[in-house]
Amino acid sequence: MHVCRPFILVVCALASIGATTMKAQAADVAAETPAPDAGQQLHAMLERYFEEWLQLNPLLATFIGDPRYNDRLPNSIGPEHRAQVRAMNERYLAEARAIDVAKLSPADRISHEIFVYERERMRAAERFPDHLLPVSQTGGLTTLMPALGSGTNAQPFATTRDYENWLQRLDGLVTWLDQAIVNMREGIAKGVVQPRPVMEKVLPQLGAMLVAKAEDSTFYAPVRTFPEAVSLADRERLTKAYTRAIEGDVVPAYRRLRDFVRDEYLPKTRSTVAWSALPDGEAWYAHYVQEHTTTDMTAAEIHQLGLSEVARILGEMDRVRQQVGFDGALEAFFTHLEVRAARVPPPAARGRRSRRRGRGRAHAGAGVRPAARQTRAGRRAP
């Protein structure tokens, strides 16, 4: 079809004018829309960080009552997860430093300072191989997961979905237990091992997980008490699934770890107990001190501060002893106070005694002797 050239030129011109107008309007709208201020940037960043942190640490989500990730258990001591945490930390540290602190409110400045401090502390911690010490007698997934799987902890077991979520978490536990062996072998090679007394206490904890039948396992407890929300068909299916998981996956994984600790790791444990005895241990311990106290004081300085504070407080107590006229040493004064405290009736008894005194005063004011003070003859008198 033939179209005259002048018409085409007119159409193109109109289109160009329209496009230019639209761009100008868009620019005007952008100019009218204010950029988020520093406070809004900070709040949005903190919200995003918390959400991403929950995804990387789903157990935290469970413990704070957020059920979205109850089916997840990452291999937190594995290289991939540790790399994800490291990358996330660096990304948010850079974003936080880009915020104009001078434009923040006083409260937001504190939030910003704390956030940056925590990111810097996490970066500093990368120097120290905590992941090579994944198992101890006081913590770690080896003891936490049985507690969660007992059905009496933060992990919910109220619906069919809850039961299925836990099965998926058990898969993650098996992966974690095997990763622990890999990491601890690396720790042996690098001289980063637990003290022997610690692992001697770990062995019976691991041994307690090695049951012959699923019914004897802590992890079996939830299927003993299904809630009404779980149908009979699902109960039967889930009971079989839990039995398979416990006997076929979880118990064998615990056995592998127990055997490794007993046969390979325990002979390589250290006779020392101080953290400073580890490779780079002095700096490692100093890092922990700073992390838990948020000061730049050394361990020796903190220890000395504690000694001086105890001396100061004891001096104050001794002045009180002198003020009340107690004739004896300070230790005897402490004993005296404990004995006196033991003789003080509990609040309920003091309240009853006070009410009795109050009734007595009321009777006396009305010309009536309290019953406790009347004689038998008086009570019989008209």
Features from the language model and the residues they span:
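N-terminal maturation segment of proteins
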Residues: 25-382
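N-terminal secretory signal peptides that target proteins for export/translocation
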Residues: 1-4
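Bacterial N-terminal signal peptides
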Residues: 7-18
